């Protein structure tokens, strides 16, 4: 297919236009007085949401070159969401700010490669400054503060803090749609491991790309499964009992996987296959953990056991299993409580005796998964539209709180980044274009604060200047419209969320600045409608 190409300033201008359109739609949601965005859905009612990553992912532009820019900013939001779980709107605002200044300077003749170097130097300095400002998250109240700011809802903040207290920092918190109008917390014993479905055809919820199996039997095999004949006797028994199944094995491929997928699509079988977590001896231990938790046995050939001769009483059971592309969560495993506690005690002793930090860390992870349980937050709302928006907020708040526990907290509301201006301002480069890159980041650091104030109906420039002249943790609380000590007022951010957002923003912005040409397919012209035959005129309808 023939291609169209644009070069230089025109290429960068096109990408900037696409980025600007997405950034404008996303940035209106920032801060406690941010607004919502309505997304059209092909089926069902529109989605009213103020979640940056959901908005960014939904935008597709008609102009192919502008759409390239839109896709890049979608990547900023997605990557920030994947790593930090929150802060996607801040990352989008920062990308737009760095890019706007960057393109202005490159159009004026600055060298993009040197400007990129300056941007990277400034970002490293900001990260160091954020480290100096951070303070550990120790109390339940501090966890609640981070979650409250993220969700803009005090009740959600307290619920997440309570969930973290109950399952511990290593425990798993899942968010699901509730069946009532109230949001509730329930702690269920369960385990999560980092292995997703082997094939996306196992998905039962296509919107969330998850496979959810209620009343599930679990086949645990310490081997690769390629032949369907090995599984057939067990699956026939499971189907006869009207239950769902989960296969956890070293791998499932070939004829076995193809047959499972075909039967899943036909609706004959409802189940899923995932690879066993870990490698080598650790995999054997983790399979044993799952077996004890679910009341099953690991079918291993080294023990003289074979899949084709295994019986149903060797299988584990769980009330619910949720598998996405990266994780599997087993909820309410039906194992013997005494055996689970004995296994946990065995792992605790192994931790005490271990001399390797790496082994200790992995053992602690296993212990948390075995004894921590799963906290389930059921999000309630009066309508489905409100529930979806609320659920996205709770997910973000949960991720922000976990990020806060990992790396600590800093003053929120854009104050921490504004305080980093001074350190970046002290950076002096020998080269003018490198210095330009440093100055670009310095100017962009106040963009989130400006946007928060603007969304609250105030003059962003005045608020930025007032915060700049204040000291320490003093900042602008957009919720009350007052200048307060942000830490004391509970307006805090997780260091990890801010750091990841800035890193991704600088990375994508610098990539766009280095762009010199864009190549896209030439849109196909739609053919004109076929003409009628001569003499068809009014078709006798005169």
Curated annotation (Swiss-Prot):
Molecular-function GO terms, alphabetical: ATP binding; ATP-dependent protein folding chaperone; isomerase activity; unfolded protein binding
Compartment(s): Cytoplasm
Entry annotated with the keyword Cytoplasm: yes
EC category name: isomerase
GO cellular component: cytoplasm
Catalysed reaction, written as an equation: ATP + H2O + a folded polypeptide = ADP + phosphate + an unfolded polypeptide
Residues holding ATP: 29-32, 86-90, 413, 493
Keyword entries, A-Z: ATP-binding, Chaperone, Cytoplasm, Isomerase, Nucleotide-binding
GO biological process, one term: protein refolding
Similarity comment: Belongs to the chaperonin (HSP60) family.
Subunit comment: Forms a cylinder of 14 subunits composed of two heptameric rings stacked back-to-back. Interacts with the co-chaperonin GroES.
Function statement: Together with its co-chaperonin GroES, plays an essential role in assisting protein folding. The GroEL-GroES system forms a nano-cage that allows encapsulation of the non-native substrate proteins and provides a physical environment optimized to promote and accelerate protein folding.
PANTHER family per record: 60 KDA HEAT SHOCK PROTEIN, MITOCHONDRIAL
Protein name per Swiss-Prot or TrEMBL: Chaperonin GroEL
Organism annotation: Elusimicrobium minutum (strain Pei191)
